Amino acid sequence: MLILSGRVYCGAFPKFLYHQYNLQLVDLSHIQIKEGFPSWLLHNNTKLEFLYLINNSLSGPLQLPLYFHTNLSNLDISDNCFQGYIAPMIGTYLPRVRYVNMSGNGFRGSIPSSFGNMSLLQTLDLSNNKLSGSIPEYLTIGCISLVELILSNNSLQGQIFSRTFNLRFLGELQLDGNQFTGSIPHSLFNCTFLRVLDLSHNDISGKIPWWLGDMSYLEILDLSMNNISGNLPSNFCHTNIQKLYLSRNGLQGSLKDAFYGCFELIVLDLSHNNVTGSIPPWIGKFSQLSYLILGHNNIEAKIPIQLCNLTQLSLIDLSHNHLSGPILPCLRSTSNSYRQQDGSYNASAPVSMDEPLEFTTKSISYSYQGSMLSYFSGIDLSCNHLTGRIPTEIGNLNEIHVLNLSHNSLTGEIPASFSNLHQIESLDLSYNNLKGSIPSQLTELNFLAVFNVSYNNLSGKIPDVKQFATFDESSYRGNLFLYGCPLMKNCTEISLPPSKSRTSIENKESSCFIDKDAFHASFGVTYIMVLLVIAAVLYINPYWRQVWFYYIEVSTNNCYYFIIDNLAFLSKFRFCNFCK
């Protein structure tokens, strides 16, 4: 056994390794080896069972040993710089391998059919390479023990599987980020133990097959970014499914019967489809739901009161629909990490999310995934037909990061309770019918990076302190009675008719001048602090103190001799003032 993972920086294989012949486990991961694949290591150590070379700088082709190696069980060469083709006979030379991970390299060409000779293979990960062609039929027939097949982010194409399919124990199938076409193969129905099915970011067409709802072990289904069409299947869910990603397809129909019974759902993403009808009341039974993404559809009617029963919600995106009525004052949005700290976090909910979710933040659509989602929360109700006042209770969402209520018909004033949104980074209330002034309490929102109240009926002076001094004119335009920086107009300009506004025009920038007293005070404090820091450094460090006084002495002597040698010249042109 030899384990040097992450302990030393080698650059090359240790020389003593060339003289080892009875090793069973070798782990040389994370030590930046910059050579080729050590086929000699397999040739010298016929009893070797585990070989881990993860995250190095190994390059060149994958060279097989000279003879069959029947004892190797685990081979992991992920996250290196290997290139070229995967050896066509790899399955013949390594017939008893159970785990193969070659992800994160530069392999190209087709997947060798000889993988089908690995009858004991349980995990095959070839993701994040440059592989092309189709999935070999012999692989789907011969790898009878395969549990995980991960081919994500390559250039594979064609039909996913042929009819001759024998992967009955398959539990995880990830084919996302390729160019597969055709429909979802019926042969997957035989994978009764399938837990994860990710076919996203392909060119798959057709309808969602009804039998996917009968796969009782299925927990994660990702069909997003395809060309799937047709109505949402009715009675689709079994109780085990937790994450459902169907965004950016051509799905249509009503939600009424589609997902009833999916009571363990944590993620429901149906954004960018043609879903119609209303949000059904039974959604309030999804007690585990954390991410509800229904934006960019044709959903109408009011927001159901049952949404208030969902205490685990982190992200709510109902934007770009036809929702009407008031905003529910009981809506919730809290990050998973906050619920965990608060003691109300559900242990069954995931700490991190592997699949990305799109959410608009700071006017830009971002993809969030992994642990980032656990620390993120937001509500987006923009681009609907919502009416009424903004509930003051929304200000109680003190852990929310994004709130977007723009492009509705909301009335009333901006609630002063928004000053409690201590973690908010983006607040968009633009294109409504809000009136009154901008509450001065909002200047206490220290993390606010994007603020937009444009095209309302707001009035009064714009706050010009703290982060509000950084927002530009686009945040406030379209409000006739707002004045101050950065709109470059004051209250006098608003009260006078245009023909008599010369005085206000001449003074329109007066509110934008820098306070000179504050500038002088801050400059003086900064200057004193710099002197104190220099004095502290010289006091603490004897070496620098000695260097400092030596430098002063040398400078004084130079100045003295300069004056003596050039006294006449300096007197004539009065350069004595220059030395002061």
Predicted features and spans:
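Terminal membrane/secretory targeting segments in land-plant proteins
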Residues: 492-580
